[in-house]
Amino acid sequence: MAAKIPGVIALFDVDGTLTAPRKEATPELLDFIRELRKVVTIGVVGGSDLSKISEQLGKTVTNDYDYCFSENGLVAHKDGKSIGIQSLKLHLGDDKLKELINFTLHYIADLDIPIKRGTFIEFRNGMLNVSPIGRNCSQEERDEFERYDKVQNIRPKMVAELRERFAHLNLTFSIGGQISFDVFPKGWDKTYCLQYLEDFSEIHFFGDKTYEGGNDYEIYESPKTIGHSVTSPDDTVAKCKALFMS
């Protein structure tokens, strides 16, 4: 077998890049990733926590990729072993966190949208995930909200309000997926994981939300990466084949 290309890593977003949003990766995609790993070092970076990424990419995800970064790299694994962890609670403190959560819940309570379900705020290790409709809606309701949001700008308006109200906390608000947005301290976006990849001369990042405000934007635009904007898992495979396997 040919040796891996030295000094090069292919780093992937999850939703919309390796999988359809919140869906499991297809067997074909997983087979391709195994083949690609023989050619280059591979890593995955997702905004979700490790349990959600495992649901999508498999329970052995921390071993299937050379690097696995959940919560934008605030929880980091290399070769299946933990190499770093950062906490929002320690960073902000409970008082500021409570102020932010209370305001957000009041805002959602006053929001007039067609349907609401449950789990409007999910507290993760390194971020808050906020969903105006509630995370435990059905897939059909997700699709419906995404269409509604594109017309009514529910998430962008909410983000603008929170950004202004909590400017003193120096937070980033990042819209991702179909129904939610993430809230985390500035610099805790996906570029956070790059500190673990300084030995690589080429970091190829693949993501779908690479526009300003999207949760792949900062890492896609970073001078430390070579950014590739993709539209689907099939597009990711095609771009990787052209880059690394042709």
Curated annotation (Swiss-Prot):
Annotated catalysed reactions: alpha-D-mannose 1-phosphate = D-mannose 6-phosphate
Main location class: cytoplasm
Enzyme Commission number: 5.4.2.8
Alphabetical UniProt keywords: Cytoplasm, Isomerase, Magnesium, Metal-binding
Entry's Gene Ontology BP terms: GDP-mannose biosynthetic process; L-ascorbic acid biosynthetic process
Tissue: Expressed in roots, stems, leaves, flowers and immature fruits.
Effect of inactivating the gene: The thermosensitive lethality of pmm-12 results from glycosylation defects rather than ascorbic acid depletion.
Names of the cofactor(s): Mg(2+)
Protein location: Cytoplasm
Pathway the protein contributes to: Nucleotide-sugar biosynthesis; GDP-alpha-D-mannose biosynthesis; alpha-D-mannose 1-phosphate from D-fructose 6-phosphate: step 2/2
Pfam families: PMM
List of residues binding Mg(2+) 1: 13, 15, 208
Any Gene Ontology CC annotation: cytosol
InterPro entries linked to this entry: HAD-like_sf, HAD-SF_hydro_IIB, HAD_sf, PMM, PMM_cap
List of residues binding alpha-D-mannose 1-phosphate: 22, 124, 135, 142, 180, 182
Annotated positions binding Mg(2+) 2: 220, 225
GO molecular function, one term: metal ion binding
Function: Catalyzes the interconversion of mannose-6-phosphate to mannose-1-phosphate, the precursor for the synthesis of GDP-mannose. GDP-mannose is an essential sugar nucleotide for the synthesis of D-mannose-containing cell wall polysaccharides (galactomannans and glucomannans), glycolipids, glycoproteins and the antioxidant L-ascorbate. Can complement the yeast temperature-sensitive mutant sec53-6.
Assembly information from the UniProt record: Homodimer.
Miscellaneous: Overexpression of PMM increases total leaf ascorbate content.
Family of this protein: Belongs to the eukaryotic PMM family.
Name of protein: Phosphomannomutase
Organism: Arabidopsis thaliana (Mouse-ear cress)
